[in-house]
Amino acid sequence: MSNSDDEIQEIEAKRQKMSQEDSEVEIEILDEPEQGKLKNSSMSDEQKLHEFAIITATDEAFAQSILQDVDWDLKKALDVFYGSEAFAEARSAAVMGASSSMASSGAAVMTAEDLKGFEVSVMSWNIDGLDGRSLLTRMKAVAHIVKNVNPDILFLQEVVDRDLAPIDKLQSLYKIYYSNKGCQYYTAILVSKMFDVEKHDVIHFQNSGMYRTLQILEGSIGGLKVFLLNTHLESTREHRPQRCAQFGFCMDKVREIIAQNPGALVFFGGDLNLRDEEVSRVPDGVKDAWEAAGSDNKTKFTWDTFKNDNKQGFHGAKMRFDRLYWSGPLDKVKFTLEGRQRIRSCLCFPSDHWAINATFFA
């Protein structure tokens, strides 16, 4: 991001001061050591009707109207449902009823040429606040890593009230917006002081049994319109119907924002809990940051129990749960994982998830 030299120097001075203050958090850097399909062919047409209706929270008559048009291919039918504008209203109703619309922007449209030399970095991290073990130490480590990486924008999931102080202290560097503080757990969006915030919305998923929301922050960076969408979708394989419906709703919201705000920079991500086969067709022009950066297997798995032993009962599983999608005039991206350092004092990692960190540029 760009701003006046005085502002940049002031923020950098604060960041260095905070790094000194939390030097008691010792982090040992470790060397970096190096999942199910839809059973389409084995299912009867009746089973496909039932499965489609459950996943999409519709009925079997509706399911038949789509399945018969794609030769009863369940995967294709789900792609049609979640990717077509024609079913946006049905998808929205499945998640939460009628949704609010984002106001269109009158901001000037900037091209990649206009933004040469301009970069924006976005980090997303499920910080596992629900695990009470060594929580304060882990939150200090999270804050320590955030200050070292220094992203412009930070999405957090599984934030809890207990031992929140290290995260709250980041307000000297960031503007902090919580989704539903006081709830059992929630999300947060942190933005650089150079980000001009115009609006903050929280949409509660009515089909969620886990307090899940979509948090939306609208603002601008140096005249460039920016929308930030942070979410934590329904967890576990058995809650796939709710998760798929929530993901479809979020992508409809992204599509709506793009249509109403040409040239805006849109970031959508978080702990999506997605399996690859659950990803439906995303809107045109929207890219997956990890894929766009080259799909490096070294940075693929964000929940990896082979390398992260915080959740010992799940050893042997690794998933790409945490994802970041974007659209806009910044068309290139660099992608890394952060938070892979073990904390010396408690011999655990800051979270059971790695943080994803992406830098976007023209």
UniProtKB/Swiss-Prot annotation:
Effects seen without this gene: Suppresses axon regeneration defect in mxl-1 background mutant. Suppresses the axon regeneration defect in sdz-33 background mutant.
Co-factor: note: Binds 1 magnesium or manganese ion per subunit.
Gene3D superfamilies in the record: DNA helicase RuvA subunit, C-terminal domain, Endonuclease/exonuclease/phosphatase
GO MF: 5'-tyrosyl-DNA phosphodiesterase activity; identical protein binding; metal ion binding; nuclease activity; single-stranded DNA binding
GO biological process, one term: double-strand break repair
Keywords, sorted A to Z: DNA damage, DNA repair, Hydrolase, Magnesium, Metal-binding, Nuclease, Nucleus
Binding-site residues for Mg(2+), renumbered to this chain: 128, 158
InterPro entries hit by this protein: Endo/exonu/phosph_ase_sf (IPR036691), Endo/exonuclease/phosphatase (IPR005135), TDP2-like (IPR051547), UBA-like_sf (IPR009060), UBA_8 (IPR054109)
Region (Disordered): 1-43
Residues the UniProt record annotates as site (Interaction with 5' end of substrate DNA): 185, 303, 321, 353
EC main group: hydrolase
This protein's record includes keyword Magnesium: yes
Biological function: DNA repair enzyme that can remove a variety of covalent adducts from DNA through hydrolysis of a 5'-phosphodiester bond, giving rise to DNA with a free 5' phosphate. Catalyzes the hydrolysis of dead-end complexes between DNA and the topoisomerase 2 (top2) active site tyrosine residue. Hydrolyzes 5'-phosphoglycolates on protruding 5' ends on DNA double-strand breaks (DSBs) due to DNA damage by radiation and free radicals.
Family: Belongs to the CCR4/nocturin family. TTRAP/TDP2 subfamily.
Protein name: 5'-tyrosyl-DNA phosphodiesterase
Species of the source: Caenorhabditis elegans
